[in-house]
């Protein structure tokens, strides 16, 4: 999952910039964590993807090294969104939501696991979802591109 509203498409683990396909997801931000909503998901300034920032380490970024948050303001404060991702919800998908999104325990990125291939991981090989929640993400009610719904764009601020 990556930010797609600028000319810069970030760095994809498969090489080059990200290629958007599918839905435009809308991620809630700066809300409290709940029993079915996990916070500490951040935007990476290097690869332009979403990664989990809840551990002491920050995974492996396709842009090199570990993922990195937006830089702090001059006064040291931070204004980058802290995304809340809903998980393990009992209801099924709707016309404006999609399940089968997972945390990769190797790169710490968020990836779509609804295809036989689990995608290319920046840490090598395919993504590994062992131990991950199954996330369900809300999206705008737009038609699919016909290429699958595995790459998306997100708003940095909601």
Predicted features and spans:
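Trp/Gly-enriched beta-strand/coil motifs that build multi-repeat beta-propeller-like domains
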Residues: 1-158
């Amino acid at each position: 999952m990556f930010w797609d509203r600028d000319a810069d498409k970030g760095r994809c683990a498969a090489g080059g910039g990200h290629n958007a396909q599918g839905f435009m997801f809308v991620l809630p931000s700066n809300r409290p964590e709940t029993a079915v909503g996990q916070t500490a998901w951040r935007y990476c300034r290097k690869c332009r993807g979403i990664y989990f920032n809840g551990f002491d380490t920050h995974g492996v970024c396709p842009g090199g090294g570990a993922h990195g948050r937006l830089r702090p303001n001059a006064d040291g404060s931070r204004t980058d969104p802290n995304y809340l991702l809903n998980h393990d919800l009992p209801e099924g998908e709707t016309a404006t939501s999609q399940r089968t999104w997972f945390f990769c325990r190797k790169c710490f990125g968020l990836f779509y696991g609804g295809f036989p291939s689990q995608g290319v991981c920046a840490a090598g090989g395919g993504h590994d979802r062992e131990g991950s929640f199954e996330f369900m993400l809300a999206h705008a009610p737009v038609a699919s591109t016909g290429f699958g719904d595995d790459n998306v764009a997100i708003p940095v601020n909601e």
